Swiss-Prot record:
Gene Ontology cellular component annotations, sorted alphabetically: cytoplasm; small ribosomal subunit
Protein name: Small ribosomal subunit protein uS19
Family membership: Belongs to the universal ribosomal protein uS19 family.
SUPFAM superfamilies associated with the record: Ribosomal protein S19
A Pfam family the protein falls into: Ribosomal_S19
Role of this protein: Protein S19 forms a complex with S13 that binds strongly to the 16S ribosomal RNA.
GO terms of biological process kind: ribosomal small subunit assembly; translation
Gene3D superfamilies named among the record's database cross-references: 30s Ribosomal Protein S19, Chain A
């Protein structure tokens, strides 16, 4: 289900404030955030945002193609190690 257009995109207010401070200051520092649900807006383009994946912060460099997506899409939370092979089937 898509978000209502009259509500606008969700961006955590502190994340938005930190990105605006980075832009105003002219520095390209990394902004840490736990807000994986925040939508990437055109203001974020060119910024590096460290998104928490539950264990560590994954740096995400925002490009124009990412606008409209959520930050959590670019910070995977699970690492698939593969199914058990023939070697591991009998051992326990």
């Amino acid at each position: 289900m898509a978000r209502s257009l009259k509500k606008g995109p969700f961006v955590h207010y502190k994340l938005d404030k930190k990105v605006q401070e980075n832009i105003a200051g002219g520095n390209k520092g990394v902004v840490k955030t736990w807000s994986r649900a925040s939508m990437i807006t055109p203001d974020f383009v060119g910024q590096t945002i460290a998104v928490h994946n539950g264990r560590q912060f994954v740096p995400v460099y925002v490009t124009e193609n990412m606008v409209g997506h959520k930050l959590g899409e670019f910070s995977p939370t699970r690492s698939f190690r593969g199914h058990a092979g023939a070697k591991n089937k009998g051992k326990k």
